[in-house]
Amino acid sequence: MIYKAVFVCLVLVLLGDVFCSPRNSGGGTLNDNPFEKRTDCRFVGAKCTKANNPCVGKVCNGYQLYCPADDDHCIMKLTFIPG
């Protein structure tokens, strides 16, 4: 009888983890996942220098933005970041 109760409790805990876990809920904020798809696309083509780089930390439709050279413009990296 005790084994049956332990088994039932274990199953409930495992099911609770699967169905109630925040990582599986599809919810979340941008702070939970820094590479989550964001629409910072307004920064694509923005002027960037070493001193003023608006591309840092920006993501456009799953592609991270970066400044290829000093005194250039923000472009998207070719590597896709799943989000």
UniProtKB/Swiss-Prot annotation:
Main location: secreted
Signal peptide bounds: 1-20
GO cellular component: extracellular region; nematocyst
Listed GO MF terms: toxin activity
Domain of life of the source: Eukaryota
Role played: Toxin.
Record localization: Secreted; Nematocyst
Modified how: Contains 3 disulfide bonds.
Annotated positions of the Proline amide modification: P82
Keywords from the UniProt entry: Amidation, Cleavage on pair of basic residues, Disulfide bond, Nematocyst, Secreted, Signal, Toxin
Entry keyword annotation includes Disulfide bond: yes
Protein name (record): U-actitoxin-Aeq6a
Residue stretch(es) of the prosequence: 21-36
Species the sequence originates in: Actinia equina
Tissue localization of expression: Expressed by acrorhagi.
KW Disulfide bond (keyword) present: yes
